[in-house]
Amino acid sequence: RAHITNQRTMEVLRDLGIEEESHRYATPWEHMGDSLFTTSLAGEELLRIRAWGTGDERKGDYIQGSPCGLMDLPQPLIEPIIFKNAAERGATFACNTEYLSHVQDADGVTVMLQDRLTGREYAVRAKYLYGADGARSKVLDDAGLKVEGQLARAGTAYVIFKADLSRY
């Protein structure tokens, strides 16, 4: 699950009034830093790179880019803060719920959902539909929206494998 909270997200948390509360549960930006590549948890270090703008080379870019820094706050810790704040503003939530489809009209949107625990399908009427369903967004596809531009400059893939390399 997600854990690095970028500067744009921090700006949103500030706008929502929950930046300070979020910091209480996070690893602060100044304690973030190196990404290590090792043969095991205590094994040989293969590579160390500065990350998240904490090195001298990039920190200024990050500081100029936003009034907010980054933090490392795992999704299971930030979600309750966001849910509590939204509930205090009148929002309701349905966990273990899958988006199925939606129909938009001039007054809002009707969203079809399925309770993943019971299998029950039901409709919810809303003013807005916000899709936070990831890179292969069904909401985005169903709305007929296209993502333009290039992917980020770099991608990350973590691979763990075991192999007998003793003959080498």
Range-by-range predicted roles:
Residues 92-94, 148:
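General small-molecule cofactor/ligand-binding pocket signal
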Residues 39-42, 113-118:
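Short acidic, glycine-rich loop/turn motifs
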Residues 117-128, 132:
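Core beta-strand elements of the Rossmann-like FAD/NAD(P) dinucleotide-binding domain
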Residues 95-110, 114-116:
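A conserved short coil-to-beta-strand element within the FAD-binding core of flavoproteins
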Residues 131-145:
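Flavin (primarily FAD) binding-site architecture
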Residues 160-168:
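Flavin-dependent oxidoreductases
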Residues 1-89, 103:
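Active-site-adjacent segment of FAD-dependent monooxygenases/related oxidoreductases
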